[in-house]
Amino acid sequence: MALFSSSKPIFLRGRLITGILSAMAATNVDYKQAKTIYEFTVNDIKGEVVSLEKYKGHVCIIVNVASKCGYTDNHYTELNELYDKYSETKGLRILGFPCNQFGSQEPGGNDEICEFAKRKKVNFDMFDKVDVNGGNAHPLWKFLKHKQGGLLLDSIKWNFTKFIVDKNGIPVARYGPNTSPKDLEKDLEKYW
C-alpha cells in the first residue's frame, strides 16, 4: 500500500484514515477466490483494523450477534463458557460481529454495543457492526456463506448464525441460531 504511505497519520472527520483504507482493501478481496479467512481484514469494535491472520493456528467460532434478540442471553452465556473452557487449553477464539439486519435487534452504535458486552462480561473478540447479507455484506461474511452454504439459500437467516473455522482458516461447519453454542463442543473436538 505504498500509494497511501505517509510520514504523518491522515485523519478524516477525526478518524484515522488507515482504518478506512484497510476496509477498502478488504472490500477488494474476491471472496469467491479466497482460500482462508486470513485474507480478510475487519475493524474491531473500537474501530482498529485487524488482519484475521492473527487467528492462524486457532480454531475459531465466527458469529453474528445482537443485543436485543431472544437468543441473546443464552448465546452470550454459552459463548463465554466455551471461551473460558477452551481458549487457554485448546486455543479457541470467538469472533462476534454485531449485525442489525434481523428485526433491528442491534440498533446501537459501537459504544453502546461495548457497554452491553461489558455488562454481559463478554470475554471474546468483538468487531464492528456489519451487514452479513445483501450488497453491503462484509466480504468475510460473503466468504463464509460461499464456503458453508445454508439450507435452501446461502443467506444468513437470523442472529447468532455460527461458523467453525479450522486451524488453517477454512470454514468447516455452519450452525443456525437454534443450535446452542454448547452443542458445538463435540464438533469443535474434531479440529483441535
Regions found by a protein language model. Name each.
Residues E88-G108, N123-G134:
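Thiol-based oxidoreductase modules, predominantly thioredoxin-like and allied folds used
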Residues M1-A25:
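N-terminal mitochondrial targeting presequence
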Residues L21-E53, N74-H75, P139:
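N-terminal "domain-start" segment that seeds a small globular fold
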Residues H58-V59, S67, D73-F97, K118-K121:
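Conserved helix-turn-beta segment immediately C-terminal to the redox Cys motif
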Residues P139-K142, H146-W192:
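Thiol-/selenol-based redox modules, centered on thioredoxin-like
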Residues D111-N159:
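Short, internal strand/loop/helix patches
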Residues D44-I45, N64-K68:
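Amphipathic alpha-helical repeat scaffolds
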